[in-house]
């Protein structure tokens, strides 16, 4: 069973991607400039991962947050930094709105030619387990995020660096690590969509009777393969995941 990989396209002329949504994380806008946006299908409402890092702010809404092996609740103002290849899923209980900032600076990228940026290496590594930001750090970062959709060019780039500067200098009490372990999932697999289907089924039916046989049918996996892949890619056994819900 395998989590779905999302392929993210950074808009031409930009170093990162800014997403904005109203009502539902399934319907997002990719901001391409002041007053300009591309409508697209959001991926945050199912179990997925991507090679890009992500910073997500929930303006309004509440629900359940899944980050690696972490399961917890979120409310308005929730702000989470996600590292590359970290599986995640937001299950909103109703209407919601928010912003996401996504970027990818692999080894050898010109971003790392600036020696000042090397201080971010440890932060990006820690983000591989997910970091919930709070306190003054969250307040400052959230304000910068809200300004991103109406900024452009060097103004937007300056906001981006302000965000990174706030997070990397945040006091420990403002940073809560979410997942017990980091993940390094393969980019391609024949199990790619199965975990997403299984998790969605569990979320939809956990208050009633959940039958393992139904999950095996949905995913098309044998019992041993299901058990092995579920734990490998969610960080929990099937029973532990279900009990935590």
For the regions a language model picked out, list residue spans one by one.
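Generic protein-terminus/edge-of-domain signal
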Residues: 1-73
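A hydrophobic/aromatic-rich effector-binding and dimerization subdomain
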Residues: 2-27, 84-147, 172-173
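Residue-level detector of short, conserved catalytic/binding motifs and their immediate flanks
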Residues: 53, 78, 88
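Short hydrophobic/aromatic patches on the structural cores and recognition surfaces of FHA
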Residues: 61, 77-78, 226
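Short acidic-glycine-tyrosine-enriched beta hairpin
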Residues: 69-83
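An amphipathic alpha-helical interaction segment
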Residues: 117-186, 193, 197
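Basic/polar phosphate-binding segments, predominantly the helix-turn-helix DNA-binding elements
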Residues: 179-187, 197-245
């Amino acid at each position: 069973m395998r989590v779905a990989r999302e392929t993210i396209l950074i808009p031409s002329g930009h170093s990162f991607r800014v997403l904005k949504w109203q009502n539902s994380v399934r319907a997002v806008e990719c901001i391409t400039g002041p007053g300009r946006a591309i409508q697209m299908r959001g991926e945050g409402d199912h179990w997925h991962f991507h090679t890009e890092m992500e910073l997500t702010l929930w303006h309004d809404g509440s629900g359940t947050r899944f980050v690696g092996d972490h399961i917890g609740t979120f409310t308005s103002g929730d702000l989470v930094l996600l590292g590359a290849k970290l599986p995640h899923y937001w299950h909103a209980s109703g209407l919601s709105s928010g912003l996401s900032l996504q970027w990818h600076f692999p080894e050898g990228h010109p971003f790392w030619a600036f020696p000042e940026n090397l201080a971010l290496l440890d932060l990006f590594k820690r983000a591989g387990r997910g970091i919930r930001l709070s306190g003054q750090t969250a307040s400052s970062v959230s304000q910068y995020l809200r300004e991103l959709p109406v900024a452009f060019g060097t103004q937007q780039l300056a906001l981006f660096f302000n965000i990174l500067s706030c997070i990397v200098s945040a006091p420990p009490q403002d940073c809560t690590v979410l997942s017990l372990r980091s993940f390094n999932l393969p980019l391609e697999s024949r199990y790619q969509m199965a975990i997403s289907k299984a998790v969605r089924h569990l979320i939809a039916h956990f208050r009633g009777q959940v039958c393992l046989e139904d999950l095996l049918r949905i995913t098309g996996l044998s019992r041993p393969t299901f058990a092995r892949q579920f734990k490998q890619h969610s960080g929990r056994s099937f029973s532990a995941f279900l009990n935590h819900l």
